[in-house]
Swiss-Prot record:
The keyword Secreted does not apply. This is Flagellar L-ring protein. Residues 1-22 form the signal peptide. The lineage of its organism: Bacteria, Pseudomonadati, Pseudomonadota, Gammaproteobacteria, Lysobacterales. Assembles around the rod to form the L-ring and probably protects the motor/basal body from shearing forces during rotation. Its main location: membrane. It is found in: Cell outer membrane; Bacterial flagellum basal body. A lipid is attached at C23 (N-palmitoyl cysteine). It comes from Stenotrophomonas maltophilia (strain R551-3). One of its GO terms (molecular function) is cytoskeletal motor activity. The keyword Transport does not apply. Keywords: Bacterial flagellum, Cell outer membrane, Lipoprotein, Membrane, Palmitate, Signal. It is a lipid-anchor. Belongs to the FlgH family. The gene is flgH.
């Protein structure tokens, strides 16, 4: 067997491996952020105080509604997110260079050979570059996610965290919400809009055939990366 055929076999095997690798990578386009396993969060138990009428711990609310205020309470966040972004960039450069050397003379007479100037020279160069880019993006997210109060800050604000996993027939959907809310912004039905969540971290993603159909192939990603010289 000739060395050329061995090289062809090796190249074919590498190409097949690259194609299979590209198919596997395209399945999970965007990895999900890691979150700690969900565990019930309970407020600390108050230690009994001998000989005292009142004990430390959560108070008994007799005349107030059941809004989230303590560690372990549940709160529903209404996701109402609308974002629109648009950018445009244009770049154009042009440079021209001209160089000309006149015919030298000796004792007032030009240096010629056969009646033609042999020492005169000229050069000319030009460079042009044009670049253009446009980007437009619009996102809309609506829904409800119930989160858990994981910490109560000294100023009374609540740190909340929660996620929702949906397994559908065409893939998986995940919504993660983290942030800080102010108890005064919580409505009577124990809900709060996402626009009232400070330090908000809202993640929405999907896996499956639908998400895979919106992803570039490995060869398209290569030609759109900074590795290609074109």
């Amino acid at each position: 067997m000739s060395p050329l055929s061995n090289f062809a076999r090796t190249a074919l095997a590498c190409a097949v491996a690259a194609l299979l690798g590209g198919c596997v990578i395209a399945g999970d386009v965007r990895p999900y952020p890691t979150m700690a396993p969900i565990q019930p969060i309970m407020p600390p138990q108050a230690q009994p105080t001998a000989g005292a009428i009142y004990a430390a711990g959560p108070t008994l609310q007799l005349y107030s509604d059941r809004r989230a205020r303590d560690v372990g309470d549940l709160l529903t966040i209404s996701l109402l997110e609308n974002t629109t972004a648009q950018t445009s960039a244009n770049t154009a450069t042009n440079k021209e260079s001209n160089l000309s050397l006149g015919t030298p003379s000796i004792f007032g007479a030009p240096v010629t050979l056969g009646g033609k100037d042999i020492l005169s020279a000229s050069a000319k160069g030009a460079r042009d570059f044009t670049g253009k880019g446009n980007s437009a993006q619009s996102n809309r997210l609506q829904g409800n996610v119930t989160v858990t109060v994981i910490q109560r800050l000294p100023n009374g604000n609540l740190v909340v965290q929660g996620q929702k996993n949906l397994r559908l027939n065409q893939g998986d959907e995940l919504v993660q919400v983290q942030g800080i809310v102010r108890p005064g912004d919580i409505s009577q039905d124990n809900t709060i809009p996402s626009s009232r969540v400070a330090e908000a971290r809202i993640v929405y993603g999907g896996r499956g055939p639908v998400a895979q159909s919106n992803a570039m192939g490995w060869l398209s990603r290569f030609f759109n990366s900074g590795l290609t010289p074109f």
